[in-house]
A protein has these predicted regions:
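C-terminal beta-strand-loop-alpha-helix "lid" module of Rossmann-like NAD(P)-dependent dehydrogenases
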Residues: 1-284
Length: 284
């Protein structure tokens, strides 16, 4: 192999390594920020569920349309959260695999947040009723909540679910499906709490208060899912870029050995030519 070509390849891969290393560091910083935001949303969401739990003794499901479905048409709405960009390992593939294996497209419609999910669902023939991929993810909470709530209340869907990558740690995430409507209390169960559930004095009336608290809870669940998904995305990208950086270093090492070998062979051949020429001159 040509020595000049080898040098160009080594230089090119070294530049790629610098880029992947920088992307790895940037993703690590973004992941820590998103992780902190995800942690900070949990206490408020938990507090809302405590209020609902302690008020349930005075509230019947009939008090709020958010607590029960108006239809039994077996039609479901899925809010799918993916990423707009690639280079994040199997982050998006995990979402695609889950949808492909777990979701019946005939009885399902989708609200998507993320271009990758929008492209995949369109390719497999899923029906997308709203796509919020072009706006800032944090600004998409309110329109997603409004659209899904409106469709649920008019009886278009029996249930509404969230599908997203739940952030577990810096090296691990899991694709999960969470029920959004009808609302369920997932963080706190009555049998798990040792607190005495006192009756609240609810004013002006249980229906008005519970409706507003439930709406806040649903909106916070959407916001929490988006933040967790972003943390998982940055985590996956950080790991992908780390692997790319390590692979680039290994390739550079192997190419450097090959370059040294080629250069040594070239020097050896030149010496042989010189010796052969000297012997030829002396024999003549």
């Amino acid at each position: 192999m040509n020595l000049r070509i080898l040098r160009k390849k080594i230089k090119s891969i070294a530049n790629v390594k610098k880029i992947t290393r920088a992307m790895q560091l940037v993703s690590a910083v973004k992941m820590k920020k998103a992780q902190q935001e995800a942690i900070e949303t949990i206490p408020y969401r938990t507090f809302l569920e405590k209020i609902i739990l302690k008020s349930m003794s005075q509230v019947d499901k009939a008090h709020s349309p958010l607590l029960s479905s108006k239809t039994n048409n077996n039609k479901y709405l899925y809010i799918v959260i993916s990423s707009n960009k690639g280079l994040c390992g199997f982050f998006n593939f995990s979402i695609f695999k889950f949808i492909n294996n777990q979701i019946d497209l005939k009885n399902s419609e989708f609200i998507v947040l993320g271009k990758k999910a929008a492209n995949f669902i369109s390719k497999i023939g899923g029906k997308i009723i709203a796509d919020f991929s072009t706006i800032n993810f944090n600004n998409a909470v309110s329109p997603i909540f409004t659209e899904s709530l409106k469709k649920f209340l008019i009886g278009d869907y029996e249930m509404v679910f969230l599908i997203y990558n739940h952030f577990i740690s810096a090296t691990k995430f899991e694709t999960i499906k969470t029920q959004l409507l009808p609302t369920t209390i997932s963080y706190i169960k009555k049998v798990e709490t040792k607190e005495k559930i006192n009756e609240y004095l609810i004013e002006p009336d249980p229906k008005t208060v519970i409706d507003e608290v439930l709406k806040n809870l649903i909106e916070e669940k959407i916001r929490g899912a988006i933040i967790e998904s972003q943390a998982a995305e940055h985590s996956a990208r950080m790991l992908a870029m780390k692997n790319a950086t390590d692979n680039a270093g290994e390739i550079i090492y192997n190419l450097t050995l090959l370059r040294n070998k080629v250069r040594q062979e070239k020097i050896t051949n030149e010496l042989l030519d010189m010796v052969s020429a000297k012997i030829s001159v002396e024999s003549n």
